[in-house]
């Protein structure tokens, strides 16, 4: 059964659904959807989460990731299942169940806002800050370089998918390899960090909100917010790619 499941899932990553030359392979689709997960939200988002909500908020990010897997599957499944062969995604699903285009229009408007805010400004701002502090590159020069690269990717057909196909595996190797390296070479500190995360998730020191119960809720909310920012589960942003 395991081999059969692997054949129907993992082994289909490099196959195309269509024989057309401009169609996307399963791996390109997978890489494009994964590009939003292995990115700024998983690096800067976690650090910001700890800064605001404390170490305990990381635990609630784990909870968000666990339930987010099922949520991401449901939204992608429903978005593809409710497509009419031409349009697919959360907008088409909302239009079908709501029997009005208003919900689809609202989703599109909010998606544009989210793409400009959490989808572009945070990434570009974080990268520009790192380039400025690490290499002394002015922010406006870095922004100009990013603009040129974004233009080159945007004008080409399937350019984004082709770029993600090459970059995402490298990003994933560095991200997962770096994380495992920290755990392997610093096992005692990693164990202490995990213990601190679990402890502060349920028994934090009262600080910002003035009470232990309030701090737990604050830590939980911050962890769930940053978890959604990191994995985008429930936002419907990856459905159109699938």
What are these regions (language model features)?
Residues 56-63, 161-164:
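Hydrophobic alpha-helical membrane segments of integral membrane proteins
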Residues 7-18, 84-97, 197-202, 239-241:
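Juxtamembrane inter-helical linkers in multi-pass membrane proteins
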Residues 34, 64-84, 91, 95-125, ...:
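Helix-loop-helix module between adjacent transmembrane segments
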Residues 17-25, 55-56, 98-104, 135-142, ...:
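Membrane-interfacial loop-to-helix junctions in multi-pass transporters
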Residues 20-51, 86-91, 109-112, 212-242:
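Alpha-helical membrane segments and immediately flanking helix-loop junctions
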Residues 165-242:
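Acidic, glycine-rich loop-and-beta core segments that form the ion-binding/anion-interacting portion
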Residues 1-7, 124-131, 135-186, 190-198:
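Membrane-interface loop-to-helix entry segments
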């Amino acid at each position: 059964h395991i081999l059969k499941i692997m054949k129907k899932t993992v082994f289909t990553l490099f196959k195309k659904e269509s024989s057309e030359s401009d169609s996307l392979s399963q791996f390109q689709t997978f890489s494009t959807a994964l590009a939003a997960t292995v990115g700024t939200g998983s690096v800067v988002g976690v650090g910001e989460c700890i800064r605001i909500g404390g170490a305990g908020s990381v635990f609630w990010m784990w909870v968000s990731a666990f339930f987010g897997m099922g949520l991401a599957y449901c939204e992608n499944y429903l978005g593809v299942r409710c497509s009419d062969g031409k349009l697919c995604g959360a907008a088409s699903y909302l239009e079908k169940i709501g029997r009005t285009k208003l919900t689809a229009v609202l989703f599109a408007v909010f998606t544009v806002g989210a793409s400009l805010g959490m989808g572009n400004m945070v990434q570009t701002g974080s990268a520009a800050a790192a380039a400025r502090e690490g290499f002394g590159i002015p922010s406006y020069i870095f922004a100009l370089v990013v603009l040129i690269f974004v233009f080159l990717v945007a004008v080409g057909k399937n350019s984004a998918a082709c770029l993600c196909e090459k970059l995402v595996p490298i990003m994933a190797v560095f991200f997962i390899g770096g994380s495992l390296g920290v755990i392997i070479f610093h096992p005692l500190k990693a164990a202490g960090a995990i213990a601190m995360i679990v402890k502060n998730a349920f028994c934090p020191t009262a600080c910002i909100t003035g009470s232990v119960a309030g701090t737990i809720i604050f830590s939980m909310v911050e962890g769930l917010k940053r978890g959604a920012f990191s994995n985008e589960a429930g936002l419907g942003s990856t459905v159109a790619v699938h």
